[in-house]
Regions:
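Short, Lys/Arg-rich, polar N-terminal cytosolic tail immediately upstream
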Residues: 1-27
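A structural signal for multi-pass alpha-helical bundles of membrane permease subunits
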Residues: 31-300
Length: 300
């Protein structure tokens, strides 16, 4: 049975329809403004990388041109072959050194931070919160603050052994962040899950590796990415400790493209593009897990 509309309900209905129509008109406009703003932000952050790539394919004359042109007169793709045989910088060995140090420091951090984060998350020992606060405070220290002490401690390490020193240093400086973020993920897993595994006969280590670690995999990936990138970009400790050019990582070796009499900016930017390719590949492979780790880690 339908209820007839009264004389007073018709204006109300018309007003409601007018309001809905106005909202529908405003929604596309607001969405367009949001998309434009997001696009401008993306362009703002991508512009340095675009400029770096464009400079990497310029000729020496284009780089030295005054006033400079943003676009090259011709694409000098041969720069990507020339840098591998440039006499002042051994890009291949420097790239190998960077990879060895970054991978070694990341594995070291995982080996130490995983059980430490699990213990902090699962056991309420005296001084737990001060310990976490102290761990977080160590993030304020940088290798430049301890440059003199690091040099005195590791200056006698010669040859490729100096890579081990850089692995230890970078591992130590990234350990606190890994413990902090991984303990948050371990804390998000209910204790009842571990208790059930212990009741089924698993030991504590078996429970951590077989039960807890698969559940906090996004957090582990997040820690791995941050530690790897921080080590890949590290400059201060490598600059202080590594004196031989053939052992220097890319961050220390690249400035040698800018010599006293010749400044090969195009080769330096070419090497910069080569240096970020491994990081881009890693992001492409683990993008979904990284985003999942960054989002799920904020919810218990």
């Amino acid at each position: 049975m339908s209820i007839p509309l009264t004389k007073h309900s018709e204006p109300a209905k018309a007003a409601s329809e007018a309001t809905s129509a106005t909202r529908r008109k405003r929604r596309p406009a607001g969405m367009v403004m949001t998309l434009v703003g997001a696009l401008l932000i993306v362009l703002f952050f991508l512009f340095p990388y675009a400029l770096m790539f464009v400079t990497s394919v310029k000729t020496r004359g284009d780089v030295r041109k005054i006033p400079p042109d943003y676009l090259p007169s011709k694409l000098e793709l041969s720069n990507y072959l020339t840098v591998w045989s440039f006499p002042a910088v051994n890009v291949g060995k420097s790239l190998l050194a960077t990879a060895v140090i970054a991978i070694g420091a990341t594995l070291l951090v995982l080996l130490v931070a995983t059980p430490a984060a699990y213990y902090v998350a699962r056991f309420r020992f005296p001084g737990r919160m001060p310990f976490l606060f102290l761990v977080l405070c160590t993030q304020m220290l940088q290798p430049t603050v301890l440059a003199v002490g690091l040099y005195q401690e590791f200056s006698s390490w010669q040859g490729q052994v100096v890579w081990v020193a850089l692995i230890l240093i970078n591992g130590a400086f990234n350990l606190s962040f890994a413990i902090w973020i991984m303990q948050a993920f371990f804390s998000s897993v209910p204790k009842e899950v571990d208790e059930a595994a212990l009741m089924d006969g698993l030991g504590r280590l078996q429970t951590m590796f077989k039960i807890s670690l698969p559940l906090v995999w996004p957090g582990i990936v997040t820690a791995v990415v941050f530690v790897f990138i921080n080590t890949w970009n590290e400059y201060a400790a490598a600059f202080v400790l590594v004196q031989k050019p053939e052992l220097q990582p890319l961050t220390v070796a690249m400035p040698r493209f800018l010599g006293l009499y010749v400044r090969e900016w195009q080769y330096m930017f070419t090497t910069s593009v080569i240096a970020i390719v491994p990081v881009i590949i890693m992001f492409a492979l683990i993008e979904k897990r990284l985003i999942g780790g960054l989002t799920s880690g904020s919810i218990k």
